[in-house]
């Protein structure tokens, strides 16, 4: 069992790139397909606290439930926002990665490099062609 967990959406390029950077460090993480298996309320609250971000900062804005529920309005409490995320997991921004070095919302995907315990084993180029790690495993940006 890995000591690294990624809350992953395989339909998201940022999430796929993040997962591949974890694997490029020689680690096979625990992959939680959070749209199929959403975190519990307690798990979600812990992730938010561990990331040191606000509940609203974890909200995904470019999805239907955000518009339909009127979440752009600043009238909802954190508890209400959590309820919406639990009812509509697509509202949870991703990928979230948990390692022994910290928990981060990995947007952009190379943020994961800040919390991986092991160095990159090889060059890494994101799906869009952007080179992030050179041939020696050194971060480029």
Curated annotation (Swiss-Prot):
This is Arsenate reductase. The record marks 8, 60, 94, 107 as: Important for activity. It catalyses: [glutaredoxin]-dithiol + arsenate + glutathione + H(+) = glutathionyl-S-S-[glutaredoxin] + arsenite + H2O. GO terms for biological process: response to arsenic-containing substance. Belongs to the ArsC family. The active site is at residue 12. Involved in resistance to arsenate. Catalyzes the reduction of arsenate [As(V)] to arsenite [As(III)]. NCBIfam families: arsC (TIGR00014), PRK10026.1 (NF007456). It is an enzyme of class 1 (oxidoreductase). Keywords: Arsenical resistance, Oxidoreductase, Plasmid. The keyword Phosphoprotein does not apply. Gene3D superfamilies: Glutaredoxin. The gene is arsC.
């Amino acid at each position: 069992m890995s000591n690294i967990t990624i809350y992953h959406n395989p339909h998201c390029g940022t999430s796929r790139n993040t997962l591949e950077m974890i694997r490029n460090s020689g680690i096979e993480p625990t992959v939680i397909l959070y749209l199929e298996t959403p975190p519990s309320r307690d798990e979600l609250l812990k992730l938010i606290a561990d990331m040191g971000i606000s509940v609203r900062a974890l909200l995904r804005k470019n999805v239907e439930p955000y518009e339909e529920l009127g979440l752009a309005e600043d009238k909802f409490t954190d508890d209400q926002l959590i309820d919406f995320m639990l009812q509509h997991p697509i509202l949870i921004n991703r990928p979230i990665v948990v390692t022994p070095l910290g928990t981060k919302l990995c947007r952009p995907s190379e943020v994961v490099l800040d919390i991986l315990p092991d160095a990159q084993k090889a060059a890494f180029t994101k799906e869009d062609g952007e080179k992030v790690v050179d041939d020696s495993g050194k971060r480029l940006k």
